[in-house]
């Protein structure tokens, strides 16, 4: 796992938690929760790849890991669309920078998860 990605996650989550988007704060909290969930999933896949022999363990723990992987990609696409939408409607430069960084992070994480999953297949 790239240490820069880990610190990027922490930075984005901290920045998002400080934002006040009025009535959409519930949406923002949902995005933060999704980001945290995505980080945990990416980390667990990365650990499985590091152990390489852990594919069988991963399959035993979750026989539907491919289905779960597909769901994670759907979550990433949903988050990308949400972040793009927030980026379009916000006029605050701090929020714009945060959402641009979040978007870049999502693209990086999507690529990492794809790489991990191909190594596990």
Curated annotation (Swiss-Prot):
Q: What else is known?
A: Average number present in a viral particle is estimated to be 130-200 molecules.
What does the function comment of this entry state? Mediates the nuclear export of encapsidated genomic RNAs (ribonucleoproteins, RNPs). Acts as an adapter between viral RNPs complexes and the nuclear export machinery of the cell. Possesses no intrinsic RNA-binding activity, but includes a C-terminal M1-binding domain. This domain is believed to allow recognition of RNPs bound to the protein M1.
Q: Where is this motif: Nuclear export signal?
A: 12-21, 85-94
Q: Which UniProt keywords apply?
A: Host nucleus, Host-virus interaction, Transport, Virion
**Compartments (UniProt record):** Virion; Host nucleus
User: What Pfam families does the entry give?
Assistant: Flu_NS2 (PF00601)
Name the family the entry cites. Belongs to the influenza viruses NEP family.
Enumerate the SUPFAM superfamilies for this protein: Nonstructural protein ns2, Nep, M1-binding domain
Gene field: NS
- Disulphide connectivity of cysteines: none
Organism from which the protein derives: Influenza A virus (strain A/Malaysia:Malaya/302/1954 H1N1)
Per the record, its GO cellular-component terms are: host cell nucleus; virion component
Name of the protein this chain belongs to: Nuclear export protein
> Taxonomic lineage per UniProt?
Viruses, Riboviria, Orthornavirae, Negarnaviricota, Polyploviricotina
Assembly and binders: Interacts with protein M1. May interact with host nucleoporin RAB/HRB and exportin XPO1/CRM1.
Can the keyword GTP-binding be found in this entry's annotation? no
- What are the GO BP annotations of this UniProt entry? exit of virus from host cell nucleus through nuclear pore
The question of whether Translocase is a record keyword is answered with: no
């Amino acid at each position: 796992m790239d240490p820069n990605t880990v610190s990027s996650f922490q930075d984005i989550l901290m920045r998002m938690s400080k934002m006040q988007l009025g009535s959409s704060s519930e949406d923002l909290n949902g995005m933060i929760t999704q980001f945290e969930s995505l980080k945990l999933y990416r980390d667990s896949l990365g650990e499985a790849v590091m152990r390489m022999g852990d594919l069988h363990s991963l399959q035993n723990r979750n026989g539907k890991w491919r289905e779960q992987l597909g769901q994670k990609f759907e979550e990433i696409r949903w988050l990308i669309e949400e972040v793009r939408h927030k980026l379009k409607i916000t006029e605050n430069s701090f929020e714009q920078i945060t959402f641009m960084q979040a978007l870049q992070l999502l693209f990086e994480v999507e690529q990492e998860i794809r790489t991990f999953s191909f190594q596990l297949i």
